[in-house]
């Protein structure tokens, strides 16, 4: 249970980040930038507090933790979960069954696309058998490894066009998945010209041109606690902020 001072600190940190997002968005004429509060390893009590303050977009990195939290917070009907962690293909069925799952941001290859699509179609078949007609496409983002670091997940920049084409043209994928945009994790030691963010913008421009998709319909998820402001400057439509809102992480009970 959080004490009064902890609650005040959380709300103050959240409002500070929210204000900074608004200021930088206005400065560079960016509209409707989503602030995703990354709540991994943090208790659901903290999520409830921010939800009660009107926040809706929350990010989780671990499938089992997301499943547990989504069940515990199932009455929060307007919550929008962003999955931003590594996807194990054998857990795609569990992931796609999460209530109020808004987007999976970390799709990096065709195998994951196909697994997600198959899981969704199986879920749809089960829903139809149970007379549950609450079926809709799942938003997905293609994760691009713009920095080329071996420690990071994501497809190569030159591979993302082919993955988007597969999402849009494969029968199973186009019937169950909605291509929302691109995601990257910038190098924390990036130079001021932000080559990783520029690379993702270049990928977006190429996809728009090659596949005749309107530029403004392709979202960009880039920017975290340490670099969300330059990310917005470069065109991010969604920033993922965790420790700057919730405080440092405790990974001792990581799921």
From Swiss-Prot:
Pfam families attached to this UniProt entry: Ala_racemase_N (PF01168)
PTM sites of type N6-(pyridoxal phosphate)lysine: 40
Key words of the record: Pyridoxal phosphate
GO biological process: vitamin B6 metabolic process
GO annotations of cellular component type: cytoplasm
GO molecular function: pyridoxal phosphate binding
This protein's record includes keyword Membrane: no
PANTHER family noted in UniProt: PROLINE SYNTHETASE CO-TRANSCRIBED BACTERIAL HOMOLOG PROTEIN, PYRIDOXAL PHOSPHATE HOMEOSTASIS PROTEIN
Family: Belongs to the pyridoxal phosphate-binding protein YggS/PROSC family.
Summary of the function given for this chain in its UniProt record: Pyridoxal 5'-phosphate (PLP)-binding protein, which may be involved in intracellular homeostatic regulation of pyridoxal 5'-phosphate (PLP), the active form of vitamin B6.
Protein's name in the database: Pyridoxal phosphate homeostasis protein
